[in-house]
């Protein structure tokens, strides 16, 4: 079988010439090769982002997801999002766009995934006291409004990150990073 043309091009790039935002072991390798290796190491964490307005935090969440080995991200609602904060890390993930919350919920139910929404609304469970299921999808809302009412109703559980200061909430990009790491602590590390 002939080599992937992208592999041939990237094979010519030396370690020092590769300025992409990838860890050292991926320097000089094609996007296809990197995605294949990451897919082979998939630990099962899936996330979803409600995208009702253009939120700069989505790029931050996608970048953190990549760092934590997330392979699948669902973007619910608008297809357009600010990719600048992702620092091109979205190229190494599988991003699937879903038109509505109802469509997303149906898809997750068909996959047998538990929907765990992350938000600090009344009735949410404390993260430190919650077991995050292995076969779950962590859902994050928009900065400001948080998860939608429809998502709150559909979620199997809503989990809040405990806070100890005076602010009403932490930034959704920071909250997503904390929640993904908690899932990893419970299911992988």
Describe each model-derived feature in a short phrase:
Residues 2-189:
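Post-transcriptional modification and biogenesis factors for structured RNAs
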């Amino acid at each position: 079988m002939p080599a992937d043309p992208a592999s041939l091009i990237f094979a010519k790039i030396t370690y020092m010439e590769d300025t992409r935002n990838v860890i050292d072991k991926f320097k000089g390798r094609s996007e296809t090769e990197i995605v294949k290796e990451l897919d082979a190491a998939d630990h099962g964490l899936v996330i979803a982002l409600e995208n009702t307005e253009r939120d700069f935090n989505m790029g931050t969440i996608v970048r953190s997801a990549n760092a934590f080995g997330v392979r699948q991200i669902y973007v619910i609602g608008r297809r357009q999002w600010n990719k600048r904060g992702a620092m091109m890390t979205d190229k190494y993930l599988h991003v699937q766009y879903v038109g509505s919350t109802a469509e997303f919920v149906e898809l997750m139910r068909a996959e047998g995934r538990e929907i765990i929404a992350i938000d600090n609304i009344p009735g949410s469970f404390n993260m430190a006291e919650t077991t995050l299921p292995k076969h779950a999808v962590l859902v994050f809302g928009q900065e400001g409004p948080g998860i939608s009412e429809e998502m709150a109703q559909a979620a199997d559980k809503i989990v809040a990150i405990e806070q100890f200061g005076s602010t009403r909430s932490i930034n959704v990009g920071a909250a997503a990073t904390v929640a993904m790491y908690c899932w990893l602590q419970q299911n992988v590390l």
